[in-house]
Curated annotation (Swiss-Prot):
UniProt keyword Nucleotide-binding present: yes
Catalytic activity entry: an N-acetyl-alpha-D-galactosaminyl derivative + UDP-alpha-D-galactose = a beta-D-galactosyl-(1->3)-N-acetyl-alpha-D-galactosaminyl derivative + UDP + H(+)
Residues binding UDP: M95, E139, G140, R141, K147, D170, H310, Y311
Primary location class: membrane
Cysteine disulfide links: C92-C116, C233-C247, C301-C302
Protein name per its UniProtKB record: Glycoprotein-N-acetylgalactosamine 3-beta-galactosyltransferase 1
Keywords: Disulfide bond, Glycosyltransferase, Manganese, Membrane, Metal-binding, Nucleotide-binding, Signal-anchor, Transferase, Transmembrane, Transmembrane helix
Amino acid sequence: MASSKSLMNLLTFSFGSAIGFFLCYLLFSMILEEQVEIQPHILHNDPHGQHSEDTDNNQLQGQMNFNADSGQHRDENRNIADGLYEKVKILCWVMTGPQNLEKKARHVKATWAQRCNKILFMSSEENKDFPTVGLETKEGRDQLYWKTIKAFQYVYDHYFDDADWFMKADDDTYVILDNLRWLLSKYSPEQPIYFGRRFKPYVKQGYMSGGAGYVLSKEALKRFVTAFKTNKCSHSSSIEDLALGKCMEIINVQAGDSRDTSGRETFHPFVPEHLLIRGYLPKTFWYWNYNYYPAVEGPGCCSDLAVSFHYVDSMTMYHLEYLVYHLRPYGYSYRYDPDSAKGLEEQNKNEAQEDNPKLKQKTSEN
């Protein structure tokens, strides 16, 4: 009798434990699944991938007005930024499509696009309400270079005299125009040059990542558009950034160095956490082999005067807007001297020595 009672207790305990373990497993599975679903950013395995996809979890419903609290910044000294706005005129055009106007482009329009001297949204078809410029192309990744060519042709035909520099960005790119103006202020728009995140495969002088955005000087734009009229360049590839880079090399447009005076990158093909957190990008990831200059992970990855970030979903667009233009630490004066070029000159000298052993030996002898 006692043994039967013990057996019953054992079975009851075992059954209860099994139920408990099952419920715990179910609960943790639901929690982990939810965490995976709300993860806003994933690794993008294509170096030439152009757009992120907003899921239902990270797609913002409605548009935010970040200018509503502008009174809080009325005492802020913007003299330098305002002066550069007049001195370095930038036309921005954003690559988008009919399906992305509400999901992506409207949030670009509500944030950084307001700081362009002129903003255009380029789509396959016209939308007078948004508005967009209709390029009369098809949608799809295989159409990206063709859309880029037609967009720059449209800008050249209609707005060439309205700006000095011409910036192309995606509808999931966040751009800090004030920092871009500082970078460009060191150069003449009559110089054949363009800037962006410089990649190295396939093009001798390198080419600029499409997702991080790139900016052409007035002379570079003129040469690019003319090259298609004279058949120096052609629509020979669907890979937008690489094809444009090859064309730029053919027409002798220089791939500029967009790093700051400390040698840190300003254009970024990913969101900040991918670059700031060591180990986020595995060493087998394509990114490490594509950078023209040695890539850095951790805080040294990114300039204090960063220009752009890519794969920015609609919610992160406003996160960046707040962090860049609204958040201020109390009691600090700006600590960085962007006009001191000694740091980058020294770094370029060291890189030249590493590439040229004879120069390195001569320097050590001196």
